[in-house]
């Protein structure tokens, strides 16, 4: 296998942290979560700070996942990660999950899976769940 495109949700669940930040932003800044770019232009920096402060509560490293990522990397497999979540949140999550050093390419936001497959080239295997990831090796 030359390359894998792993959904970030296979490595860890970012949804609770994202939801909590949106709730906090709505309360603190009185903004609509669907209109962040218009109502809160620096929302990405605020999200990153919020995520960095709270990441240890939300993310735990998984020894089996870490071992699989190490094995893939050692075998020469290119590893890419994709997510619909904002890049700022994805980078913090990867760092706290201990996966950042194994990842060659990260794509985030709408269309991330399509972009990661283009970056990794033909034949990249898509992995959507932790179970699929652990079954790769």
Give names to the regions the model predicted.
Residues 42-52:
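Short, basic/glycine-rich phosphate-binding loops at helix/coil junctions
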Residues 52-81, 91:
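Short, acidic loop-to-helix structural element flanking the phosphoryl-transfer center
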Residues 1-39:
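Active-site neighborhood of HAD-like aspartate-dependent phosphohydrolases
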Residues 16-20, 63, 92, 137:
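Generic recognition of short, well-ordered alpha-helical segments
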Residues 31, 76-78, 102-103:
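A generic structural motif
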Residues 83-85:
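Conserved phosphate-coupling serine/threonine residues in phosphotransfer and NTP-handling enzymes
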Residues 1, 70-73, 87, 91-137:
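Asp-based, Mg2+/Mn2+-dependent phosphohydrolase catalytic module
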């Amino acid at each position: 296998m030359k390359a894998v495109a792993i959904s970030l949700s296979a490595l860890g669940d970012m949804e609770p942290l994202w939801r909590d930040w949106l709730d906090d932003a709505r309360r603190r800044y009185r903004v609509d979560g669907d209109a962040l770019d218009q109502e809160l232009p620096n929302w990405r920096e605020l999200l990153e700070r919020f995520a960095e402060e709270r990441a240890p509560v939300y993310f735990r490293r998984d020894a089996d996942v870490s071992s699989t990522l190490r094995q893939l990397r050692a075998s020469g497999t290119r590893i890419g990660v994709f997510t619909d979540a904002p890049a700022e949140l994805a980078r913090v999550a990867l760092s706290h999950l201990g996966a950042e050093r194994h990842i060659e390419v990260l794509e985030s936001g709408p269309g991330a899976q399509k972009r990661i497959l283009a970056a990794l080239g033909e034949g990249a295997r898509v992995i959507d769940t932790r179970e699929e990831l652990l079954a790769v090796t």
